[in-house]
């Protein structure tokens, strides 16, 4: 060991000396003595490794307390950090999909703080059913006879098939054998549910007679799957639920539908593209309809199944139901969200998903122009900051070909180097509340459709 190396090792402080320093008192109070000591030992090992490798001390050796504070602060951050979603995708799966209404947030907090009547009947002091209150709400909204709630729509489809068609055939159009994120495929789900898939028709055209010819003594269901994350256009043919229900009645085979996104209101009244609604399919006579709680409905992640009482009873009594059931926080948030639908006049104001989807391009354009000047003054030396028209998308597999006119702030590096965009985007992801945009066509785009807290946004970006 050289004299220089020995000198470097001698500069490493003892842990007990560091702990006596006043700057460590607050760290020990905040994070605990055990964790602080554990980290200091780790840092000493790191410092010794640096000395061995490069004959120097790490830069942070000049202020151990500051480095410990920085590391423990970062470590204490939640894995689920709030972000500002300026990607242009409203229901962004990777960012948690639907924002919850304030009523839902309050309902969850109350359910977490106190025992609740999850499965307790106050009338007779007996055991209740956790789905009952929500089932009544869903029946009121959709016109169904009964309802069942599980933890997501994939679970809803699995339960629906396992409880009503295990060991039998399910007839589905070839053009509706969807795959959603995470390689969730209808054929795979059918196998897991113990069903045999019977494909009919072709990718682009399926006729009523295709279903008719497929039905046999082992057929349990005729199934429709809403292709919510893609669209087949051109020379196409598909039969709707009412026609399929008529055929099912003739052949004595029930019809079920996986609706996917599941809007409970006609979106066209808000100037948005129309999406099929569960109540329309129930009115058409479909026996079971499944849909998501955290997409267009605007609630928590949940799988909702509405339909005929006898069919729902089979789902409720199936062993998978207990494995897939929703917890009290999900049920509390979903109930509060569904109650908003009983007052449709105020829905676009109180339901964040609908509020964001219905923001007009003109309002967003004015917001962008208001923000452009201070951001251009701050970033103008390196980037051209402009207001540009753009198209938002709904996301989460909802209305895949439809776009919403919007406006964005774009940042274009004066030197044209893409690495500067990557660096800027990375810097914004390190903010206390990360700002998430997207890089496209030589620009960093911030679609402002989902920006509601301008002051917070500016405070962070102008630091």
UniProtKB/Swiss-Prot annotation:
Residues recorded with modification N6-(pyridoxal phosphate)lysine: 295
Full protein name: L-seryl-tRNA(Sec) selenium transferase
Keywords in alphabetical order: Cytoplasm, Protein biosynthesis, Pyridoxal phosphate, Selenium, Transferase
Cofactor field: pyridoxal 5'-phosphate
Record keyword Cell division present: no
Subunit structure: Homodecamer; pentamer of dimers. Binds only one seryl-tRNA(Sec) per dimer.
Subcellular location: Cytoplasm
GO biological process entries: conversion of seryl-tRNAsec to selenocys-tRNAsec; selenocysteine incorporation
Class of enzymatic activity (EC top level): transferase
Record-annotated membrane-spanning stretches: none
This enzyme's EC code(s): 2.9.1.1
Catalytic activity, reaction form: L-seryl-tRNA(Sec) + selenophosphate + H(+) = L-selenocysteinyl-tRNA(Sec) + phosphate
